[in-house]
Amino acid sequence: MASFQIPVINLEVREVKDIVWEKIQEPVNQRRLILVIVSIALLLDNMLYMVIVPIIPDYLREIGSFDDGPTPPPLRDNITGKIIPVHHDHHGQDSATGILFASKAIVQLMVNPFSGGLIDKIGYDLPMMIGLTIMFFSTAVFACGSSYSVLFFARSLQGAGSAFADTAGLAMIADRFTEENERSQALGIALAFISFGCLVAPPFGGALYQFAGKEVPFLILALVCLLDGLMLLLVMKPVKEAMKQSKDVQDQVIPIWRLLMDPYIAVCAGALTMSNVALAFLEPTISLWMEDNMTTDNWKIGMVWLPAFFPHVLGVVITVKMARKYPQHQWLMAAGGLALEGFSCFIIPFCSGYKMLMLPICVICFGIALIDTALLPTLGYLVDVRYVSVYGSIYAIADISYSIAYAVGPIIAGGVVEAIGFTALNFLIAFSNLAYVPVLRKLRNIYDFKPFENEANILMQDPPNKEYQTYVMHDQKPVEGGVKNHLEYGQQYQQEQETNLDDQQYEYQQQQQGYQQGYQQDQGYQPGYQEQGGSYAPQGQPRVANPFQQQQQQQQQQQQQVQSRGPAAPANPFRQGF
């Protein structure tokens, strides 16, 4: 049976498949594809987290999980006729919504220590596939769930999937992008997708929930998760082969508790936790605060987060460019971002308009971008310099830092809002962020251990950069053809001179031989004549001894003695000097 031939390119499907598979297996394309897969996985995970912000409070009230009780009639001022707003008693809805939000982070916090160690042992591809599979099922359960208990189970299941997918994704980027600037840029792109998921998901979920129902946004995200898993199948085999080649490094795994005891890593982890405290406390509470003070439209409540995407991406770009020029000042960028978050939390409770509220939220997201983009590459750098370049446990610590904020934040936020109000909650967030800023000063000296500027970590299977030309160490000739080892070069050049000193000595001998010939012509015997029988006959004179000729004769005798002993050893092209 003849295979189908594609009309335009005149190639069979099998040939096209082989060409595409060969291109995918190239190291450069592998890294690009891995970055795309990890970015989609992080986008999906954060969209699943944030898409429920405008949906869950209204949906739980709709299915009757909470009862607001009898609504009192609106009060009117007898003089002006102005309607006085009535305080809504949510009957524990703040706390219950916060627990539902925090269930994902609590499970993720418990699974992360095990997922990080497992990733260090077996590689990155299989744990990431496990995470995507769990996230797919949790999203499907979210779409079909119609009670608080089912939604709680789906939310917790998503936390287990995130513990594998997020940690494996960040570790995979750090492992494949070993050069510091490339790693910062790749992690910056991944953080841009994280921000896109966090900030676009609320308007995405709110609009689809209001106009199409609760099931539609979750079914779309489940489809994206399935497609990302299929893309991961394309890189699983090559990545697994690479892990087998570096098995000797995998055996030197550093325990996660030992990394946590490192003071520099602990400071970075604390900063990542504090950077996410603001969003973790505000996300489950600001929607109810907006319903009481601004608007009850679900799409508007979700849309308040959308403009913050642009300053977040701007913060990522600025931090990547600044880190490339001033890597020793990344701690200062993180400190500035944390201070911006604290000042913005002071402003939020005093915002009286919908558009005014967008401004401090944008500044908060800009500060988060500064912190995350500066500290995530710093964690990989600390492991490279102080430990072994295995990244599962270190990025499990980063994921634990996020999980602590999102596990504790929603639960405490709901209780604080019910006890002392939304304004006091924002003040507590602001003071905690500003208090942690001086702690980041401990990171100011970590780049004293920075390698030489021209020294770079490369992957052995990557092709050489076209900016460089490889030369043989011996005679400075470009390497022709394929790559050879030192034994092959030794066989190729064994007939040539062994060292640069031999070349100089050989030139010296040639020069002295020419000098000797000139000496004989100039200083040699000019024939004298004696009259013998009416004719002149030449009469010889004794030749003056030439020290250079004697030296040459001695050297020739020594060479003959060496040749009589046997063949010389092969020349070593890497030996220099004597």
From Swiss-Prot:
One of its GO terms (biological process) is chemical synaptic transmission. One of its GO terms (molecular function) is xenobiotic transmembrane transporter activity. The chain crosses the membrane at residues 33-53, 99-119, 126-146, 155-175, 188-208, 216-236, 264-284, 300-320, 331-351, 356-376, 388-408, 414-434. Keywords: Glycoprotein, Membrane, Neurotransmitter transport, Transmembrane, Transmembrane helix, Transport. It is a multi-pass membrane protein. Residues 54-98, 147-154, 209-215, 285-299, 352-355, 409-413 are lumenal, vesicle. GO terms for cellular component: AP-1 adaptor complex; AP-2 adaptor complex; terminal bouton. It comes from the Eukaryota. Residues 1-32, 120-125, 176-187, 237-263, 321-330, 377-387, 435-578 are cytoplasmic. The keyword Nucleotidyltransferase does not apply. InterPro entries: MFS, MFS_dom, MFS_trans_sf, MFS_Vesicular_Transporter, Multidrug-R. Glycans are attached at residues 78, 293. Residues 507-534, 549-563 have a biased composition (Low complexity). It holds the Pfam family MFS_1. The keyword Transport applies. Its main location: membrane. Residues 507-578 are annotated as: Disordered. It is found in: Membrane. Belongs to the major facilitator superfamily. Vesicular transporter family. Involved in acetylcholine transport into synaptic vesicles. This is Vesicular acetylcholine transporter. The gene is VAChT.
